[in-house]
């Protein structure tokens, strides 16, 4: 997977990924993203401000996320819990989505781990809808810990991960052509 900043000519592909994610959430009975948000304007702003990232598989937009660095007002208003560490600067992931073509293949976990490894600083935060058990499970697999609730679109569950120095994933993507290196030819 190639992970990089999104380009303006990818807006339509990214919006399509977000629309597919919205439909998936609706079909799963999850009331997250069932209004106008997220939309093309959000993606456009993300790209112009240098915080929109894509994960590409075979040149196709497979995943998207907005990466914010700094404090966020809603995150400062955490309740029914507290952050494990109160770092003044942290990284948050928003609008995390994958396309239907790559759903269920571990793309989001790989994408988020790659983003974590590529960002400076140890403090990573993310929020999700209480009903979004898939995202909650992915965050926990990545080492995030539930910390409380934040006032975003009513209420969202807030998670935090403290990255260990030089953290690298426990898995490695192996190109099909390189499988012989593992003695599986």
Task: Please give the residue ranges for each predicted region.
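A short beta-loop-alpha structural element at the N-terminal edge
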Residues: 2-16
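Conserved acetyl-CoA-binding loop-helix of GNAT-fold acetyltransferases
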Residues: 98, 104-117, 137, 141
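Conserved GNAT acetyl-CoA-binding A-motif
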Residues: 112, 118-130
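Conserved beta-hairpin
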Residues: 49-68
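Conserved GNAT-fold acetyl-CoA-binding loop/helix
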Residues: 22-42
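C-terminal "cap" of GNAT-fold acetyltransferases
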Residues: 152-185
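Conserved acyl-donor/pantetheine-binding loop and adjacent beta-alpha core of acyl/acetyltransferases
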Residues: 66-97, 103
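Conserved active-site alpha-helix within GNAT-family acetyltransferase domains
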Residues: 130-148
